């Protein structure tokens, strides 16, 4: 074992603190302070140091989030305080009945109120003790003359919080360090899943406070964002595994995985909502209301849902509920209702619990998002990649405010699992509250003569045999001349994020394919005025505009062209990454998968798809024809001599990061001297001089980015905005024109709403960028 020096010990501690702060800023505050690549490099360095010097490993190190060995089983543990579920209310009248009950209970108690309203719960010092824990408030003085029947109960504050659709967790901290994470279980006994809990980046391994309390317990909800959930299901579907029914089931199943490495890959998130302290910590943290409790949780380093609101009346509660019933579809996670609590923790304590529920809280559920209907038939769709998707044709039904007539059945495996028959009664829901899908079949209601639906063996569009590739759940048509694949490819090529051909919509694409004028994307650039005007409802003016739009599309940058080619798994971000590494189509088309996967962010599977696509003769012919037509197939070379020197300097910096402390200092001194000499210390964005924006929607506008975007990193979005003439700032102010909102928008979004700043999704931003030509 290498000798541990004070210098190495101090350096390791500093490295650990930097990573902890960067993780907190990214996962909890949603305000990144460190580039992903830098974080990954520093984490790897910390792992190497801890491997070399095991005595430096501490329980709250970022390296300890994922365990090395899978667990063999989970141990049952008793909760320090029972983890009760909530009573449900399904409409406002039931909420009012709950209010009447707690008010009546309060009057019946006729006890003296303890003021000030203090929230303290006694917890015994050892989490292994099995005694019952009781809520007490022995430290606050009793004020005479202040009993329940003298209080204006109608003026008591409520606090409303979104009910996150996930799995409840109880987290125990001793001396500020996370020592246990447990599931709800039956409310009295749960399972110790500490190893899995540590993989959730929004759960602090160490409380962010000096001199922490001896014992702290935090309750909250572990959940999967909609985007992460959909990605997990897509991966499971691809390898032939059964997909999860909903994010809640996926979160629960993930938490009970014996291998924490699997848990880490699924990117669970966590919102904290309750804090319990030991009685003798009275001088440490003072809080008297649930709203103060939430603020304190944030100070301790926890992520708290930003949409909570204190309401002074049931009318305000109703308004809050109605607002989020309409707005929840815009959230990046699922919420199935609103949790309404009495804000006063002392009043909560006085009211106590029934055998099942707290008397001081209730879950006001949204209208049902699942509803039964009848399958009248099944049709099969063919996507642009040849994927065959069965779709249930339903008896029209109202669901989440819209009429649903069709629902996805995903693939043949899912269809077989459901054992679907025409005429079956099925339960339908909005997947991610957006796309309708069939959740389950009710076979007990099946008509006697109902026929099981059989997946076709031949493509419904071109009649060619269908195949199901190994290790995939999706059945495909592989006929490159299939009309459905061609229609999808043309629509994708013309989309705003690709070549942005204005006027080439779905109906016109259908006409071009049906008429035989277009049999390949390349045929678009051979269309004449005579060809177009021969189509129904296509006059000379419209035809001329379309020809102009197609001419303009030839100048779109190489990254857009690559995206437009429709290679599987090559979205806008991957296209950007690939074209930076391979600035010409010749370089990319000749690259092997092993070369392609060296691009940061491109895995071996995507690399294989890219290599295979360019090996298909029909695709090679398409690329050649597009080049002949004048479509851009390379990135303009913006690499000056100084920029090339910059690459050398960056290589030196990377080398420095791998050296010992003394050698690193020498190399860093060299880098500093090069800076003074005027050498640029950052890579020039290869897209910056592709288009000089003279005017447009974004020019001169101020943007703020918040949350995790679906397909882009925030630095990529920032570069695109700046290239279009916009300005990106880190904080929201009255001068902010737009806020681009990703998953878990946080406090920036909240402030933007108050200031009336216009919100943009990633797709809306890309549309605006497409208009500018970026």
UniProtKB/Swiss-Prot annotation:
GO MF annotation terms: DNA binding; DNA ligase (NAD+) activity; metal ion binding
Substrates-to-products reaction catalysed: NAD(+) + (deoxyribonucleotide)n-3'-hydroxyl + 5'-phospho-(deoxyribonucleotide)m = (deoxyribonucleotide)n+m + AMP + beta-nicotinamide D-nucleotide
Domain BRCT: 693-774
Residues that hold Zn(2+) according to the record: 459, 462, 477, 482
Record keywords, A-Z: DNA damage, DNA repair, DNA replication, Ligase, Magnesium, Manganese, Metal-binding, NAD, Zinc
Ligand binding (NAD(+)): 36-40, 85-86, 161, 184, 221, 341, 365
UniProt keyword NAD present: yes
GO process annotations (BP): DNA repair; DNA replication
Cofactor: Mg(2+); Mn(2+)
Domain of life: Bacteria
Enzyme class: ligase
PROSITE patterns: BRCT, DNA_LIGASE_N1, DNA_LIGASE_N2
Gene3D superfamilies per record: 5' to 3' exonuclease, C-terminal subdomain (1.10.150.20), 6.20.10.30, BRCT domain (3.40.50.10190), DNA ligase/mRNA capping enzyme (3.30.470.30), Helix hairpin bin (1.10.287.610), Nucleic acid-binding proteins (2.40.50.140)
Residues at the active site: 163
Enzyme nomenclature, EC number: 6.5.1.2
NCBIfam families from the UniProt entry: dnlj (TIGR00575), PRK07956.1 (NF005932)
Family: Belongs to the NAD-dependent DNA ligase family. LigA subfamily.
General function of this protein: DNA ligase that catalyzes the formation of phosphodiester linkages between 5'-phosphoryl and 3'-hydroxyl groups in double-stranded DNA using NAD as a coenzyme and as the energy source for the reaction. It is essential for DNA replication and repair of damaged DNA.
Name of the protein this chain belongs to: DNA ligase
Naturally occurring in which organism (per UniProt): Trichodesmium erythraeum (strain IMS101)
């Amino acid at each position: 074992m290498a000798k541990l020096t004070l210098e190495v010990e101090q350096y390791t501690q500093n490295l650990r603190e930097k990573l902890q702060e960067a993780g907190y800023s990214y996962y909890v505050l949603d305000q990144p302070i460190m580039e992903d690549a830098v974080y990954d490099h520093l984490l790897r360095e910390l792992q190497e140091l801890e491997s070399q010097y095991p005595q430096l490993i501490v329980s709250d190190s970022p390296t300890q989030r994922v365990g090395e060995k899978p667990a063999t089983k989970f141990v049952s543990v008793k909760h320090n305080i029972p983890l009760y579920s909530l009573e449900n209310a399904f409409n406002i009248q039931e909420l009012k009945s709950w209010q009447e009950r707690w008010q009546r209970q309060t009057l019946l108690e006729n006890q003296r109120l303890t003021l000030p309203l203090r929230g303290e719960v006694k917890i015994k010092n050892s989490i292994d003790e099995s005694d019952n824990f009781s809520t007490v408030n022995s430290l606050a003085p009793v004020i005479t003359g202040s009993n329940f029947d003298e209080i204006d109960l109608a003026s008591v504050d409520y606090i409303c919080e979104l009910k996150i659709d996930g799995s409840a967790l109880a987290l125990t901290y001793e001396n500020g360090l996370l020592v246990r994470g447990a599931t709800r279980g039956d409310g009295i006994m749960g399972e110790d899943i500490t190893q899995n809990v540590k993989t959730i980046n929004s759960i602090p391994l160490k409380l962010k406070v000096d001199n922490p309390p001896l014992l702290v317990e935090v309750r909250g909800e572990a959940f999967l964002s909609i985007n992460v959930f959909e990605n997990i299901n897509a991966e499971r579907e691809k390898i032939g595994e059964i997909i999860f029914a909903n994010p809640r089931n996926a979160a629960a199943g993930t938490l009970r995985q014996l291998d924490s490495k699997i848990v880490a890959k699924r990117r669970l998130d966590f919102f904290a909502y309750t804090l319990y302290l030991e009685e003798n910590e009275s001088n440490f943290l003072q809080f008297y209301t649930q709203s103060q409790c939430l603020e304190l949780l944030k100070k301790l380093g926890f992520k708290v849902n930003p949409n909570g609101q204190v309401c002074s009346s049931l009318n305000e509660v109703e308004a809050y509920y109605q607002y989020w019933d309409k707005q929840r579809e815009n959230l990046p996670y699922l919420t199935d209702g609103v949790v309404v609590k009495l804000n006063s923790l002392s009043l909560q304590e006085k009211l106590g619990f029934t055998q099942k529920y707290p008397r001081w809280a209730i879950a006001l559920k949204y209208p049902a998002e699942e509803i039964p209907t009848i399958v009248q038939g099944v049709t099969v769709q063919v996507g642009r990649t040849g994927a065959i998707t069965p779709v249930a044709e339903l008896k029209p039904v109202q669901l989440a405010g819209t009429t649903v007539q069709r629902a996805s059945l995903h693939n043949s495996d899912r269809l077989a699992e459901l054992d679907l028959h025409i005429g079956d009664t099925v339960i339908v829901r909005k997947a991610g509250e957006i796309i309708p899908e069939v959740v389950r079949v009710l076979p007990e209601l099946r008509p006697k003569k109902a026929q099981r639906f059989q997946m076709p063996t031949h493509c419904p569009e071109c009649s060619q045999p269908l195949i199901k590739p190994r290790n995939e759940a999706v059945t495909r048509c592989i006929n490159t001349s299939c009309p459905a694949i061609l229609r999808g490819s043309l629509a994708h090529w013309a989309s705003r994020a690709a070549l942005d051909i204005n006027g080439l919509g779905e109906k016109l694409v259908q006409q071009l394919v049906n008429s035989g004028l277009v049999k390949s994307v390349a045929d678009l650039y051979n269309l004449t005025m005579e060809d177009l005007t021969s189509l129904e409802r296509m006059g000379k003016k419209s035809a001329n505009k379309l020809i102009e739009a197609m001419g303009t599309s030839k100048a779109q940058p190489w990254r857009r062209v690559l995206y437009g080619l429709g290679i599987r798994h090559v979205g806008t971000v991957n296209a950007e990454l690939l074209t930076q590494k391979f600035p010409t189509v010749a370089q990319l088309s000749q690259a092997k998968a092993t070369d392609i996967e060296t691009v940061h962010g491109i895995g071996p599977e995507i690399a294989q798809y890219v290599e295979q696509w360019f090996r298909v003769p029909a695709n090679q012919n398409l690329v050649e024809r597009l080049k002949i037509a004048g479509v851009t197939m390379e990135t303009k070379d913006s690499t000056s001599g100084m920029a090339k020197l910059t690459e050398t300097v960056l290589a030196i910096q990377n080398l420095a990061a791998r050296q010992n402390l003394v050698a690193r200092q020498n190399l860093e001194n060299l880098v500093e001297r090069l800076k003074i000499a005027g050498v640029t210390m950052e890579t020039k964005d290869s897209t910056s001089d592709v288009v000089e924006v003279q005017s447009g929607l974004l020019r001169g506008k101020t943007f703020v980015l918040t949350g995790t975007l679906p397909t882009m990193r925030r630095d990529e979005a920032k570069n695109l905005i700046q290239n279009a003439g916009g300005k990106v700032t880190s904080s929201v102010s009255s001068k902010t024109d737009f806020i681009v909102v990703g998953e878990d928008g946080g406090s920036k979004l909240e402030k933007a709403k108050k200031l009336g700043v216009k919100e943009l999704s990633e797709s809306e931003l890309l549309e605006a960028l497409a208009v500018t030509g970026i």
